[in-house]
Amino acid sequence: QDRAGQAALSRIAQQLQAQGMALKARCHGPSGAWRVEVTVVDGLKASKVVRGPLADGHEVDMGTPAGVPLAAASVDAGGFSPDVQFNRQWLRTLMAQHRFSNLPDAWWHFAQQGSGPVSVAAR
């Protein structure tokens, strides 16, 4: 886990807090990728940003649980409600604004762009 990634995640958490949500991010395995999930803290504020059931203390509805490697969690998985599709796209966009790419295996799996030994050494 590099400092740039942690700093970016901290900025994302601050942005989400202002929108009535909280970020949970854990380094996921030796690849340095991140498992990301978003929890609703204030449903009224969150309703201006995301869709679906927004009960305080519950995760934003992404169609499958975070951290569970299911075929339905893949980025290309179909058959979800418009709310779930919207929320997944919203999360991809939010993370991309902070230089994280969504890995194709799961909506909750992200890697920081330009991370790795070469980029870290170049800084």
Model-derived features: positions:
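Cell-envelope/glycan interface and biosynthesis
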Residues: 1-122
